[in-house]
């Protein structure tokens, strides 16, 4: 997760440390995975290097951290146990569940499924947020989590030159760069405005198209709040 995401989201002070915590799925595009490359990276990353985990746990002690919160990634659970502090897992899917659904293909990830599942089972406090992909017996189940809106939809419409009364649709690929080949066709839907984060390197307003860079001056939850519908990728389906 890039540093600017936290700068946009957290009002207080924080220290940002860049660290690879999981491989996930290597993607060629938002809609196409690279499974062979994913396997190569998993083979070099798992199981975790114990010396690496030890070094991170020592740094955790130096920083006087009292809790590790893990957003899907299981590495924090291992580090927390090594450091002797509690861990919290927040997820609506886990990587063992994702990899397990590929095992019947040429994606030979069975050994990673078992390894990661054992780690997830060791977490001190487990939270699942809707929409949940695989329900488990957890400590807390909750509604979807989101950042609070900061600017009204009316103000966003005015800033983006979107007329009152028209429908607005967002097209998003979850922050992964994509070349949209159909933007010209959307211009024919003149009664609908389309907001496309990542649709341009700079902000561009073209007829009914609002093309924004991936990291724009607009707070993403405000953009979503302005829309009547969102079209996006369905995760690792």
PLM region spans:
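Active-site regions of enzymes building and remodeling cell-envelope glycoconjugates
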Residues: 10-22, 85-87, 138-148, 189-195, ...
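Alpha-helix C-terminal capping/helix-to-coil transition sites in glycosyltransferase folds
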Residues: 62-64, 122, 225-226
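Short, polar loop motifs at secondary-structure junctions
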Residues: 2-6, 72-75, 128-134, 175, ...
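Conserved nucleotide-sugar donor-interacting segment of glycosyltransferase catalytic cores
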Residues: 51, 55-117
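Conserved nucleotide-sugar phosphate-binding/catalytic loop shared by glycosyltransferases and other
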Residues: 2-49
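A donor-sugar binding/catalytic signature common to diverse glycosyltransferases
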Residues: 67-72, 89, 218-237
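Donor-nucleotide binding loops and adjacent catalytic segments primarily
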Residues: 153-229
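A nucleotide-sugar donor-handling region in carbohydrate enzymes
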Residues: 98-99, 104-178, 218
């Amino acid at each position: 997760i890039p540093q600017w995401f936290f700068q946009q989201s957290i009002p207080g002070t924080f220290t940002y440390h860049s660290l690879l915590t999981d491989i996930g799925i290597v993607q060629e595009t938002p809609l196409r995975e690279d499974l062979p490359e994913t396997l190569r990276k998993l083979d070099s990353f798992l199981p975790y290097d114990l010396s690496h985990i030890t070094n991170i746990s020592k740094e955790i002690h130096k920083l006087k951290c009292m809790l590790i919160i893990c957003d899907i990634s299981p590495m924090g659970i291992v580090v927390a146990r090594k450091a002797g502090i509690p861990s919290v897992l927040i997820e609506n899917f886990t990587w063992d569940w994702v990899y397990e659904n590929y095992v019947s293909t040429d994606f030979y990830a069975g050994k990673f499924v078992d390894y990661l599942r054992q780690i997830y089972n060791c977490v001190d406090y487990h939270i699942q947020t809707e929409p949940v992909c695989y329900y488990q017996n957890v400590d807390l189940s909750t509604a979807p989590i989101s950042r609070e809106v900061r600017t009204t939809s009316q103000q966003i419409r005015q800033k983006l030159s979107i007329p009152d009364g028209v429908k607005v649709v967002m097209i998003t690929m979850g922050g992964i760069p994509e070349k949209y080949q159909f933007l010209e066709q959307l211009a024919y839907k003149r009664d609908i405005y389309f907001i496309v984060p990542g649709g341009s390197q700079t902000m561009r307003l073209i007829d009914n198209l609002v093309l924004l860079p991936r990291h724009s001056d607009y707070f993403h939850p405000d953009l979503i709040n302005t829309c009547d519908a969102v079209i996006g990728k369905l995760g690792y389906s």
